[in-house]
Amino acid sequence: MPARLSWPALALVVFWAVVLGAVSVAVIVLALLGAPPAPPLVAGGAATPASAGAAPAGDNPAAATRARESGPGVAIAAPDAALTEPAPDYPGAVLPRIGPGGVAPRTLYAGGSDPKDRRPRLGLVLGGIGLSLAESRAAIDDLPAAVTLAFSPYAADPAPLLAAARARGHEILLSLPLEPQNYPLNDAGPETLLTGAPAAENERRLEWVLSRITGYAGTIGALDGLHGERFAAQTVNFTLLQRDLAQRGLFYIDPRPGAPPPSEIPGRAIDLVVDAPPSEAAISAALDQLAERALAHGSALGLADLPRPVTVARIAAWAGTLASHGLALVPASALIVMPPATAGKPEMVTHGE
């Protein structure tokens, strides 16, 4: 007859049997559950909600989400070398392009806005930045981040102003010198794109203009109070310009109030120029008219041609009243639309991958 285990020995055997059984069950459960989820890439970062509107075709959706949903006043992304290419005629200079993965400058460098805000939206572009250091710096510091700033290609030293504007969250545009009405009496400078110039010369001038600064989301055909009316009226040249800008991942703001939306590129036309004439009373009246248009139509986009002290002061005071009137001030990029000819279709990309 086999020997019986004593009660202490039997208890010890039961204890270890229970332990081994529990360990086995735990191993099986962990195997079924798999590895724990990875932590977010940015410590403490919350998931970003989907954009209220679809990203333009050809844009990287993740880049669009980062840019458009980062929120008002968040710093603009620093220039990314992957979104540039060498300027053939200007050694050391670079041109914008669509980067790897389809990331476009117009999304990466777009100013922040709240996609959940359903109030009527109002945008304002302030031009002439970079020509006067004092006036430009005052505009950067004194105006809300949602005001979009258009830099002149003729700015002597734009780098410090660009850095300050990005840090404050201002979306940046580049002003294009296009042949205006009454040229040459009205002259947009030595690199103006002209209706009578050979195509190769206009291409060289555009290359020079686009290479003056980096990190801009779009362009505008306004420069120092001139709005490029004659160039824009010449269909062939204007179409080629839009296509070149679109292939570089930019958007275009047409400064001619009431003009149709750009036909070849994401963009929008200005609804109202608010500083013509540049008097305090006229500016205040124009800004109020712009707000009324936004309330009536759901959105509106204004342009102030130059950062005069009176203009900056009036815009700053007016912007502080918009929330009480149920309006949201947003960057220009939040108001652009896709051209009908390309809406829902992939963009042709020649300046990129």
Regions found by a protein language model. Give the residues of each.
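Extracytoplasmic/luminal low-complexity segments enriched in Pro/Gly and acidic/polar residues
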Residues: 264, 272-353
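Membrane interfacial helix-start segments of signal peptides and signal-anchor transmembrane helices
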Residues: 2-30
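Hydrophobic faces of well-ordered beta-strands that scaffold small-molecule active sites
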Residues: 122-126, 145-151, 172-176, 219-221, ...
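Juxtamembrane proline-rich low-complexity "stalk" or linker regions positioned immediately after a signal peptide
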Residues: 29-100, 107
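Catalytic domains of cell-wall/extracellular-matrix polysaccharide-remodeling enzymes
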Residues: 200-281, 306-316, 322
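Active-site beta->alpha N-cap acidic-glycine motif
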Residues: 103-187
